[in-house]
């Protein structure tokens, strides 16, 4: 790894390349049927194998002055290899994210007021989407190809907040925070499901579920 401080430790840069090998990794076998009924043998639906994770991590910080904060970026790959899945070849782990970026900044307006901002971006999680379908006894059966070969949409959002700290005393400290979560209302995907399209018989449509689009908030903190 690489680490260096500048300007009397006011600025800091760290970079590291890593590789990690993992054993006893768990995943569901192809066509697993998971139920949580009493007596259900969940372990029969699991397979065990190995994994690996490697990549580059970078972070830069500014630690003094009116403007403080940090930028971090990770370029990574996380994979599994389990006999019985994906033709016994390496495949993307569910939590694999190629890019992961965070930017955090705080600006002190005066001794009582400060402004803060956060921006995050990451590649969507690896998932397995259906590639086809067929009808069996009146039910739609989806077909799948390689494990985790698809991606959820990228996740990103921006948060802003303003914090007010009244005068302090020896016995009590307090602050008010006024913030906005997901400033530009990004509809980040929580889940994507597939169903028959009633408007176009014989076709399939994807339904995206999103949570927490634009959320204003007020927080009061105190400590003795």
What is the predicted function of each stretch?
Residues 11-15, 69-71, 103, 115-117, ...:
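Transmembrane beta-strands of outer-membrane beta-barrel proteins
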Residues 1-43, 175, 179:
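Membrane-embedded beta-barrel scaffold of Gram-negative outer-membrane proteins
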Residues 23, 48-52, 93-98, 150-157, ...:
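Short sequence motifs at beta-strands and strand-loop junctions characteristic
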Residues 112, 121-138, 155-159, 163-224:
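C-terminal beta-signal and adjacent terminal beta-strands/loops
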Residues 6-10, 62-68, 98, 110-112, ...:
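Strand-connecting loop/turn motifs
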Residues 1-5, 59-63, 72, 106-108, ...:
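Transmembrane beta-barrel domains of outer membrane proteins
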Residues 29-39, 76-80, 85-92, 131-140, ...:
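Flexible, surface-exposed loop regions and adjacent strand-edge segments
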Residues 18-21, 40-129:
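Gram-negative outer-membrane beta-barrel transporters
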